[in-house]
C-alpha cells in the first residue's frame, strides 16, 4: 500500500473486499427474497422495517471496528509489529463485548422502538420477532466484523471473501429449509442469519490463529491493552456515532414512509408503500456496500501511508478512490434501474392493480429519487474515509452529523410536512449527500495542504 502503483493495487484490494461485503448484504437480500414466498403478507415489509433500528444499535458498537482497522493499519505502516498484535487481541475482545451489549439492548427495546416508528398489528409482531432473533446473534456478527477489520488492515481481503462465501451459501440453504420445508416466516430467516454469522465468526478467528504475521491470534495473548483500547475508541467511537446518527435519520425516514402508507392505503392490513420501500432499500444496499468497500479501501491505504509519513501518496489515493467509486456506483445504480421489473419481482413487487400497483409505484419513486444519484453518496463516503485515514474520525463524524443527518431531519420536519409525499422524503438523500461530500472534500484538501506544508518546511530546515 505504501509502494508502487496505487490505482492497480487499490483495485486488487477493493474487489475481493467488495465481494465480501456484498455477500453480507446478500444475507439480508436472501432473507427478504425467500420470506416473500412465505404465508405472511407483510413479511418483506417487516424485515425492511427493522433495518434502520437494527443498524442504529449494532452499527454504533460495530463502528468501533473502524478504529481497529485504522490503528492496526497505522501500526503495520509504521513497522510496529508488537503494537499491532496488541491491537488485534484487544479488538477481538472488544468485538465480543460490544456484541453482547448491543444484543441485550436491542432485544429489550425492539418492540417499543418499532412501535414508536409507526409499526402496528401484524407488521409490528413480525418485525419484533425478526429483530429479537437477529439480536441474539449480535455477538457473532460483531466478532465477524472485527475479525474482517483485522484482515483488511493487513491488506488481506481474500480470506474474508472465502469464509463469507461459504457462510453465505449456508445462510441461503437454511433460509430455504426453514421457510419452504418447515413453513417458518421471518423467524426462520432470522435464525438462518444467526447460524451463518456464528459459522463465519468461528472460521475467521480460526484463520487468524493460523496466520504467520504480527496479526496472528494467540489465545494466550488475549488481553486488553489499555493503549490499544484507547486508540481504538478514539477513532471508533466517532465512527460508531456517525453510523448511529445515519440510522436514526433513516428511522425517521421509515416513520415518514409509514405515514404516506396510511394516506395511500388507509385501513389496509397489507402495507404496500412499506413493501416497495423495503425492496428498493435492500437493492440500494448492494450499491452502498460496493461503494463503501472503496471507502474502506481508502481508509486502509490512507492510514498506512500516513503511518509511513508518505503524504504525497494520499492525494493519489483520493483520486484513485473517486475514480473507482464513481464507476462502481454508476454500474450498480443503472443496472438496478434498467432491470427494475425483474429485480422487484424477486421481492414479490409486481406492476399490477390495486395495492400491488401502489407498492410498485412507491418502489419506482424511490429508485428515481435515490438509486440513480447514488454516486453522490459514493463521493461522500470516500472523502469521509480519507479523513478517518488521517486519524480525524471526530471530524468525519461531525461533518456527517451536520451535512447528512441534521439536514435530513430538518428536511423531514419542514419540506415533508408540507408536501406529505414519497418524493419529498426521498429527495432529501441526494441533497444531504451532496452537501456532506462538498464539506468533506474541503476538509481533505486542507488536511493535504497542512501535511504537505509541514513536509516542505522540514525539508527546508534539513537543507
Q: Can you say where each PLM-predicted feature lies in the sequence?
A:
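Short alpha-helical transmembrane segments in multi-pass integral membrane proteins
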Residues: 1-14, 72-139, 170, 181-237, ...
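Residue-level signal for short hydrophobic patches within transmembrane helices
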Residues: 3, 7-26, 30, 53-60, ...
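Transmembrane helical elements of multi-pass membrane transporters/channels
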Residues: 12-31, 133, 167, 196-200, ...
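Transmembrane alpha-helix boundary and packing residues in multipass membrane permease domains
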Residues: 17, 21, 33, 70, ...
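Helix-terminus/linker motif at the lipid-water interface of multi-pass membrane proteins
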Residues: 22, 26-44, 114-121, 177-184, ...
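Small-residue hotspots at the loop-to-helix junctions and early N-terminal turns
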Residues: 41-52, 127, 131, 190, ...
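Small-residue-rich hydrophobic transmembrane alpha-helices
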Residues: 44-104, 141-160, 254, 274-340, ...
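Short runs within selected transmembrane alpha-helices of multi-pass transporters and secretion channels
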Residues: 65, 134-152, 160-171, 189-204, ...
